Each structure stands twice: as structure tokens, then as C-alpha cells.
Curated annotation (Swiss-Prot):
Signal peptide start and end residues: 1-28
Keyword Metal-binding in record: no
Entry-linked InterPro entries: CRR_secretory_protein, GNK2, GNK2_sf
Family: Belongs to the cysteine-rich repeat secretory protein family.
Stated name of the protein: Putative cysteine-rich repeat secretory protein 33
Gene: CRRSP33
Any single GO CC term annotated in Swiss-Prot or TrEMBL for this entry: extracellular region
Keyword tags: Repeat, Secreted, Signal
Subcellular location: Secreted
Residues of the Gnk2-homologous domain: 34-133, 141-250
Pfam families: Stress-antifung (PF01657)
Length: 253
């Protein structure tokens, strides 16, 4: 059985009007790592930049991804290379390493000889750039897009939208708080909620180096109202934060 997903909106620098991603549902738990989207920039083959990129990408591959995130740079002035990589909150350690390998291979395939680019998968994203800045990142509206399930909700659409939005805001409150040690922000929350005879599954997540997780996620919820009212599933995806809801389980528990 297949369900299709549509890339319904791209902001600023995306010139893709629509895309459909087929997600194979092999079991009741729909765990996939489908390619979602990408964007690229060019560089010269055999350049010093390419050598630095190869060096840094190999270094990142050796990480254990305990928290599923890294922001690393090779500082060489104009030859600087920065990699930002994050896994979905339920994918870490070996699963995160596997997603990094997939994302890196996908980046090299879709962005050959590119001086930076971003590629998104279900379970991770990879951002390669020349920006040598490890300071906390602000909201970036250039690299955000939304996707939705083409199927509409049956019944009271307004009630579904309202309850879904309220649940997402509840998850934001859980994600935008400190961990049990009171040191780091969690920046991830997931849960489920009964909606009559159906169950709503949802998650919210921010990058570990963002200045304001709450602001990014609240902005993303507003985007849902523009693209995805009454849809059985939807997501807003970026490199700063992302959120998703479905009427089927899609996360590891």
C-alpha cells in the first residue's frame, strides 16, 4: 500500500513547484528515509575546497552522533567548509550514522562539484556551506518548504485543524525547555493524541544551534494553515526547525 506526499510550497530560493514522494507502508509503523528535497551551489573540481570538503566529511563520518547533531568547520579562510547535520529525534547513533552516509551520498549525486548545498531526507538533513560561523543560528526563511498528504480529513475539518494546532503547540512547550540536568534544551518532542476513532501522531524539532526554537516552530505552525488545512498529514521542513503530523505512526518509540 502506498501513500503519496506532495511538496506543496517552497519559499524564496526554491523553484520547485511540486513533487510527490511515494512512501511504502510495509507495516503499521511507517518508518522511511525517503529523499525529500535539495538545493546546490557550484565549485571547481579538484579545487582546494573539494579537498577540504572531503576531509571534513570523513571526519564527521567518524562521530557517534549521541545527540544526533553536529556543526563543524574546517577554517581555511576562503577555503572554509562547514557541515551542519542533524537526525530526526528518534534516529541516533548507528541509525544517525547510516542517515549521514545516505545524505552525503545523495548530496554528491544530486549536487556534483557543488560548493555547498542542502539535502533533506525523512530522518535527517545535511547542510554543506562556505560559511565559517559556529555561533547560534537565527531563523532562515530561505531554506524552508512544506509538504502534505494529498488526502483530506473526513468530518469536521475546522475541529481537526484546531485540535492538531493545539497539540503541536503543546509539543513546542515540551521541546523548548531544559533537559533533566538543566543544561541543554531538549529541542525535540513527539507524541500522540486520540481524535475520535483515529490517532494523531506528531513531532516537533529544532536544530541544536538555533537561537529561538519556539519562534521557529510557531512560525512553522502558521505555515501549515496556509498550505495544509484539512490534510491527513503535513510537515514544514527546514534546517532550523521542522514539524510533522500524521494519522499513522512514523516515529520509533
Amino acid at each position: 500500500m502506498f501513500s503519496s506526499y506532495s511538496l506543496c510550497k517552497c519559499l524564496v530560493s526554491f523553484h520547485i513547484l511540486a513533487i510527490q514522494v511515494l512512501i511504502s507502508c510495509a507495516s503499521s509503523l511507517n518508518l522511511t528515509n525517503e529523499y525529500l528535497n535539495h538545493k546546490c551551489r557550484k565549485y571547481q573540481p579538484g579545487s582546494e575546497y573539494e579537498k577540504e570538503l572531503n576531509t571534513l566529511s570523513r571526519r564527521v563520518a567518524t562521530l557517534d552522533f549521541t545527540d544526533g547533531f553536529t556543526h563543524r568547520s574546517n577554517s581555511r579562510d576562503t577555503k572554509s567548509v562547514t557541515i551542519i547535520f542533524q537526525c530526526r529525534g528518534d534516529s541516533y547513533r548507528s541509525k544517525c550514522n547510516s542517515c549521514y552516509a545516505t545524505a552525503l551520498a545523495g548530496f554528491r549525486s544530486r549536487c556534483p562539484r557543488n560548493k555547498g548545498g542542502i539535502i533533506w531526507y525523512d530522518q535527517c538533513f545535511l547542510d554543506v556551506s562556505m560559511i565559517n560561523d559556529n555561533s547560534p543560528r537565527r531563523m532562515n526563511y530561505d531554506n524552508i518548504f512544506s509538504m502534505h498528504n494529498p488526502n483530506n480529513v473526513r468530518g469536521n475539518v475546522n475541529s481537526f485543524n484546531k485540535k492538531t494546532t493545539e497539540f503541536l503547540y503543546k509539543l513546542i512547550g515540551k521541546a523548548d525547555r531544559l533537559d533533566v540536568d538543566g543544561i541543554n534544551f531538549l529541542y525535540y518532542a513527539a507524541g500522540e493524541m486520540r481524535l475520535g476513532k483515529q490517532t494523531l501522531f506528531a513531532m516537533v524539532q529544532c536544530a541544536k544551534d538555533i537561537l529561538s526554537c519556539k519562534d521557529c516552530l510557531e512560525w512553522s505552525i502558521k505555515e501549515l494553515s496556509k498550505c495544509c488545512d484539512g490534510k491527513q498529514g503535513a510537515r514544514v521542513v527546514g534546517t532550523i526547525c521542522n514539524l510533522r503530523y500524521e494519522l499513522y505512526p512514523f516515529l520509533r518509540t
